[in-house]
């Protein structure tokens, strides 16, 4: 059957197409995109902030032993990470709601200030309790930074430039995952662990200055609102009502209970303990209550409207982000263990050894972003990303104590190449699906999926690694004290193991790391499945400012 011919000149267009074009043209006409040097400064500032966020999450890892020694707080170790995570996850949807109601630039600035305040509290902490409070405050501020940065890019840049700019931001900021432990170790060894937090202040100040001197356009609401973008607090009562604070409290309860269950399960409490079971059950009930409440208040007020979360492209993108983040963090946390424990290199050199994956990721993030902006299609890159990362993770899972340099360089590069292909595709899918005023909500959900999914897979990887290490020690070094080896850590076990038992312990460590990458392969396989749900959609390109409707065929 032939396609219908386009209308001749002078004939009216079909009503549906006309309304779509009018909406897009109206949005474009109201948007005041920035270009040139100003756009470059905006990209630099939000990249600084995203880098800062990932640096803060990774830099504390090498400082924790010294912190626990100073505060005599070994029992509080779990809270140094979970306090940040709990606050960050619980506030993600609320942060997205704030970006839809209040001015984009100053809301982002407020979150940055809260994050910096948390860093000051951590750096100045005189007790373990003060440090935990500071981590929670930093998590509150961090809940609005990555999603705010992505929202700023999607508002400030023309549609055809957004893929490459998002790729640049996400690709470069991921370097912080490698730099964090290196800087943390350097500060702890040569200065003080407090600089692990104070380093956030100058970087954040540079980003804040760049944003304050540049005018960033706000999103345009498609309907008349009780709130004014120019005067966001003109009606405080209406603002509070639209924030859906009841929904926030219920969602925060869900996120807190599930996060605590994952944090404590297998370490503080056994998985079968009443505490862990109670937390999972309570989190499940809170989630059900949240869904019912959101349906009750309706999309106009709901913190996570059904019209946003219910779209297949949105929830598939969020799940893609969660599994993608899980795979990425397995690489980031367990490759250094392989290099330091198995290859016996220093923390600094292990960071250098991870450069092939990082370079492949950064290069391909920019290349794929440019290609998506030119062609308008993001789904092939998401699918290609899943395939390449799965292959790379599978190859890395074959690492042995004597794996050659050529192999560990090339295998990392393949995985990094794949990560760079797909890391920005969920954000692009969400932006192409939702209206401009709903974009911040969708991005917040994706960032929540990224944070929550990454945390979940790190917990799973920790269980897999611990189990694999104990099994390997009993098989390859049955005479060693397993508890002493695990207590000594990945860099200290050589001091407590005899020369005869050392090869067996190294072999056990190598196999335990390999097992964690089976988990990365599984996570990446899930991204391949959910990528199809992100939709075959052609986004606007430089020569075509109209998005092509999705085809489900």
UniProtKB/Swiss-Prot annotation:
Record: glycosylation sites: 21, 543
Main location: membrane
SUPFAM superfamilies referenced in this protein's UniProt entry, alphabetically: MFS general substrate transporter (SSF103473)
Biotechnological applications listed in the UniProt record: Compactin (also known as mevastatin or ML-236B) and the intermediary metabolites Ml-236C and ML-236A are inhibitors of HMG-CoA reductase involved in cholesterogenesis. Their hypocholesterolemic activity might be useful for lowering cholesterol levels in the blood and reduce artherosclerosis and coronary heart disease.
Domain of life where this protein originates: Eukaryota
Signal peptide coordinates: none
Topology with respect to the bilayer: Multi-pass membrane protein
Family recorded in the similarity comment: Belongs to the major facilitator superfamily. TCR/Tet family.
Protein name: Efflux pump mlcE
Organism: Penicillium citrinum
Lineage of the species this protein comes from: Eukaryota, Fungi, Dikarya, Ascomycota, Pezizomycotina
Name of the gene: mlcE
